[in-house]
Design a protein with these regions (language model features):
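HIT superfamily nucleotide-processing domains
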Residues: 20-260
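Bacterial N-terminal signal peptides
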Residues: 8-18
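Bacterial N-terminal signal peptides that target proteins for export
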Residues: 1-9
């Protein structure tokens, strides 16, 4: 028992040190260190600290953690398998978990949503290699900014199922494209593959992609929509990251808490 406590304490120290380097952008590997420390602490003590949650139900290669990013109180999901980012081939291999579905479910539970169902408040963002600060895949969880929500709602009536369509500037100075999925079941969708296929002949590297999952109303029913943009897109002034699209806390939402 004492040995487990000592190792758990050591894992916490490692995680807090990694948090510090991450917070000050000193090391692009810091998030991976935090993930490993959370997993180690969870295995030894049953507590996910300093993460909010550790899920290893399918084993470490299929698991994920949920945690706050330093300072900004940004909530993210990060896999417990080493995955560099949106460009990682594993995400399109057919063997990867549906991290977007996991993130949507977790964020919905945090904010009084409807579990896996579409919710027009929520959105998930994976940054491109140009805008991310860490070389471990992580999904930013939040609510769309009011301006982004209005832009998506205005574009929705023009979207056709299964077709990527330009929707203009979802945020200032950055054009986006949208794919109406025709589905209200995110577990049946593969946003990473859909974005990769949609932009395969348009960009030189998938590392340039920013991928977003949101929802919109079509014919009175909500469906999931996959949005994407890329660094160097025509008329883009600078690459857009999650901080331009998301509110870190949803209005009137309860304080985030995840039970084990």
């Amino acid at each position: 028992m004492r040995r487990s406590w000592v190792f758990g304490f050591a894992a916490c120290v490692v995680a807090l040190t990694a948090f510090a380097t991450w917070a000050f952008a000193l090391d692009r590997r810091a998030l991976w260190s935090v993930v490993n420390a959370c997993v180690a602490d969870y295995k030894l003590t049953g507590a996910p600290f300093p993460c909010l949650k550790v899920n290893l139900a399918g084993g470490k290669d299929q698991g994920y953690v949920i945690l706050y990013a330093p300072f900004v109180r940004d909530t993210i999901l990060a896999p417990t398998r080493k995955i560099v980012g949106v460009e990682d081939p594993f995400l399109r291999s057919g063997a990867a978990p549906n991290y977007f579905a996991d993130a949507w479910r977790a964020w919905s539970n945090l904010n009084g949503g409807r579990g896996e169902s579409p919710d027009r408040r929520f959105a998930l963002v994976v940054n491109s290699a140009v805008t991310r600060s860490q070389d471990q895949l992580h999904i930013h969880m939040g609510c769309l900014t009011p301006s982004a929500r209005r832009a998506l709602d205005a574009a929705a009536p023009k979207l056709a199922v299964g077709q990527w369509s330009a929707i203009g500037l979802l945020v200032p100075h950055q054009p986006f494209w949208a794919l109406r999925t025709g589905s209200a079941d995110l577990a049946r969708l593969d946003p990473f593959r859909l974005a990769a296929e949609g932009f395969a002949g348009r960009i030189r590297s998938l590392a340039l992609l920013t991928v977003v999952v949101a929802s919109a109303r079509f014919d009175g029913a909500d469906e999931f929509v996959v949005l994407a943009s890329y660094a160097g897109a025509p008329h883009a002034w600078w690459p857009v990251g999650a901080e331009n699209l998301l509110l870190a806390r949803c209005p009137s939402a309860p304080r985030p808490y995840l039970s084990q």
